[in-house]
Amino acid sequence: MEQKGSMLLKVVSIIMMVGGIIGAVASFIGAVLAGIASAAMAQPEVSDAVNSALAAEGYSNSTGPVMAVIWIAVVIAVAGSVVEIIAGVKGKKNWDNPAAAQTLMIFGIVCAVLSLISNILFATGGMGVQIVSILSGLVIPVLYIVGTVQLKNQA
């Protein structure tokens, strides 16, 4: 008996749901830490000390822009986690429905793009390049997209 649907899509969808939940928790922690940093930077003595340290390294008055980039990255990471959870749920539900393949493919592409943007912003904001995050943020959505192509080819 020939199997209908994409087992790859089903498995990767479950991984995406779990990853999305972990990402949401990590994003929440990131938001808390960014909030603490923002509150600390609101204190003139802290802000002056940080600006002095950055100026000594050649970065003058850059704490505001750095914090803005970090906050934007946190918002995008939260959005990415939500999209990843939704994509996982929809993929798990529709792993054997070729009519849903196009919509699922769009979810996979959006997940990959949001992950890439978030990683670029974190690196730009001084958080460093997170190779594991970049790879997992791209490999899983690419596998999800491959699963949607398998599903679409069954139509």
Can you say where each PLM-predicted feature lies in the sequence?
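Membrane-interface interhelical connector segments
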Residues: 39-63
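Membrane-embedded alpha-helical segments of small multi-pass membrane proteins
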Residues: 4-40, 63-154
